[in-house]
């Protein structure tokens, strides 16, 4: 080995090669396609992975500031397009690509990010969660949108035209750009924190997918999902569907449509109130008419036309009770008298005059009621006795004999048939006004 030969250190060789990479115009900006490999997500820091194809592999690094601009989440095996520079990493002596931009190969980065977030939130149930109903008559409506855009003007104009008593409060926010998503979510939280709103509208006008992208950010979607106020989303045109639209309680195609969903038409409300008033009045009239018909029907029923039918079944029981009343009347009177004496003695001891008078009045009422009841029972029983005597008189044998009937006795025994008689036997014939003696001369036993 020649002594004149100069040996390089590993460091010197590595630094020489590194400078070659840095000054090579073809390696300063490389457009590369490959498949993501060995990717392990590292939140809030630099990302390390590899890019490979069927025959080769290259290490890749993407610094935190560059990765923050990536709209989708890289996945193992995903084909991507990257832009970066090739450099040499001195400690290992290996070359790698420093990725500055990255997007999916074949599908736009924003679309890929949209689909990934949509799938994630759907799995968490944010799209299928129960939707909060919109209040029918909101008093205060919060609007999160740009201060200078046409959205707030359309909402205010539509609300004043339809329901002028509602108050619109603007929570101004950027609606496009990198800082817009965080500001939109903060304003949603502010509107909820105030606690005196009925409805929340978020939105912006139409634009490209990049312009609408803040409404596809996860931070905005979660702010909408956590809102205690019902949220109406009006982002872009009718054909645009953002993540915010899917999470919101109601989606509106335009800001004007959002205002129309938020408030009713004042004149329609008045008309509805008048119709409801008429309906209630008619219902009341029908109710009164039905009750009047029922009352008329009741007035013609036997309860009023033949009231005696109500107590006919109780007359017999009343007779029995009258008898018991007659028997108990004196006992009740005696008990009442004894009670009166006791009360009178107590009152004499207590000496309140009004209590004595009250007791005397009660006793007098009891005596009058007892006397009336006793007299009524006596009259009823006297009538019953008269009717019974008349019935017995009609059945009396003497009464029957006055009509020409008589009966025969033999030896002071009533003769019931010819078998009790003998020829030549003397019998007595009893008639209404006396009796006569007769002798049996012939007995005929025929029918």
From Swiss-Prot:
- Write down the CDD domains for this protein, in alphabetical order: ExoVII_LU_OBF (cd04489)
**Where, subcellularly, is it found?**
Cytoplasm
Q: Which Enzyme Commission number(s) are on file for it?
A: 3.1.11.6
- What GO biological process, any one, is recorded here? DNA catabolic process
Is the keyword Cytoplasm assigned to this protein? yes
Pfam annotation, one family: tRNA_anti_2
Keywords from UniProt, A to Z, are: Cytoplasm, Exonuclease, Hydrolase, Nuclease
Enzyme's top EC category: hydrolase
Reaction catalysed by this enzyme: Exonucleolytic cleavage in either 5'- to 3'- or 3'- to 5'-direction to yield nucleoside 5'-phosphates
GO molecular-function terms, A-Z = exodeoxyribonuclease VII activity; nucleic acid binding
Q: Which InterPro entries match?
A: Exonuc_VII_L (IPR003753), Exonuc_VII_lsu_C (IPR020579), OB-fold_nuc-bd_dom (IPR025824)
Q: Which GO terms describe its cellular component?
A: cytoplasm; exodeoxyribonuclease VII complex
Q: How does it assemble?
A: Heterooligomer composed of large and small subunits.
The task this protein performs is described as: Bidirectionally degrades single-stranded DNA into large acid-insoluble oligonucleotides, which are then degraded further into small acid-soluble oligonucleotides.
UniProt lists the family membership as follows: Belongs to the XseA family.
What is the designated name of this protein? Exodeoxyribonuclease 7 large subunit
